[in-house]
Amino acid sequence: VYYTRDAKVTFTVKTTDEQSGVKSITIYQDGVAKATKNVDSSNSATFTIALSDTAENKITASATDKVGNTMAPENYGSFANGAKLVHDITVPEIKADLAHFYVDTNMEGVTTYYEKQDETINFSIEQKKSGLNSVNVTINGTSLTEDKNGKSLTDANRIYKDVQQEMTTKDTFAISTSQVSAVGDGDYEIVIAVSANVDEKDVYTKTIHVHKENQAPVVTDFQVIGASKETVSDTGNYGYYANTDVTAEITVSDGNTGAGIQSISYHLTDADGTEEKEVTVECRKRPGEDAVIRIPIQAEFKGYIYLKATDNVGNVSLDYYKSVGILLERSEAHESNRNVVIEPEKTDTTDGKGNPLYASDTSVAVSIEDPYAGIRSIEWSVNAPYDTGNNRNGIVTVDNNGAISDEAWKITTADRNLVTGVSGQIPVFHNSNDIVVNVK
């Protein structure tokens, strides 16, 4: 078998006849005479034949001597066996099954196939007319001697070039990134190189860029728009406060080498542990792009946001991201949630208006509760119209870690970092009637 990419072939036929001498040579293509030429002084003739894509292109030749005897084509010279001339202008076809990969093409035009673990790539090579000549597969520059299933890649070249010229037009292999170590953060460059019998010097390649990535996306920023933010010592504590509806804004990243964010799932859980229905937001972010979602939260919510993100190859966090506590309470609700109790010391004496009357300094016991939002500050004052010099006032504050500014006041109840109950004594030193104690 002879192979060519040319539409026409030129060759010279030489013969001998020691008795009467050779007059002419006739060329046949698939048994049909194409041309007859007289021989030159060396008994040779040169022919140009147009090849057909739809025929076998078997070339034979016959010689006619000077007395008119013609020899049968099949019995003449090196073409006696009816050698085929395979005309093939096609190139090898290399196909790879990459449907199970996430694929992305960057701004530079480089296409990368992302995987979570070592996936199998099934590929086929084909040269329909002239047949395959060789195949070579490299991953990160390392030539594979066999595919994932143990099929030899080295023997393939030998079989394709078999001396019997048994044409192999198609072959299949299965490879995996597990066969070679990754470069950098999980990069693999797979090159499949194939040549055909029509021109074994021409090598045709298919390059596949694969990136293996097994890291789940992470939350890189969390904000509650419309709420004040306080520093917390523990993520289970409350740190965002507002008296209106707010919006939580969450940024999620899969890093510079990740596959990109596919979706984010979240649910709200209140302080009692009741979970709302989980919501999944489809993000479809490409590699290198952050995903930002906004979650509206109505006032009167007290609790946490739980969140998980999934990237484009299926990496997902084992545990939910838990936000800092969010506490929302409308002003009108605060009035019903708080409770202030003021108790003067007991006495059997009263003034003309029925108010308690004391012969000496006294004090007032104060108990304050806010089981929902907690206590952030206490403003108190003692005022009398006839002894203004002893009028007094003060402010007691509670920080976001639950520490109280005046040790004379005692914490009676708490909810994480929220101080929900306090008690204290307010001294009264006035020598006056109509003394008024205010607590806010």
Describe each PLM feature range:
Residues 1-440:
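Low-complexity, disordered linker/stalk regions enriched in Pro/Thr/Ser/Gly
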